[in-house]
Amino acid sequence: MQFQTDHALVVTTAAVAFLKSHPRGGQEVSITGFCLGGAMAIAAICNVPGLHAGVPFYGLPLPKYLHFDKVRAPLLGHFAETDAHVPAEKVQAVVEQARAAGVSFECHFYQGGHGFMRKPDPQSYHAESAQLAWDRTIAFLKRHAAV
């Protein structure tokens, strides 16, 4: 089965609407994801109305989903210094594209490989990087969302 980004964006749009309308939900809905989920977090920020903030971890969407001219939500990106799947040059290009459109995109690069947050993967996991990325994520969401 192949991942369908367009369908995932439809589902994400419905999820955001549900969360905002739910009695225990809130108006400040944010999104995060890892790897493909990180790519989806950026794609959703660019294409799903109503998201308040985004925190992608080591993932980038296809260029056709990058519509930063519509974005008002800030982003905090976490990427590995050495990542064969998501090279730093591509990350920098996306960050520059976002910033050129006036989007706040804070970006950090960490030791470890693709999946540096994933403890069960000793080849990529990097404990200090994982903790720092998590601490930055919590601080970011406290500043930009109802956490």
Could you tell me what each predicted segment is?
Residues 1-147:
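N-terminal cap/leader regions of alpha/beta-hydrolase-fold enzymes
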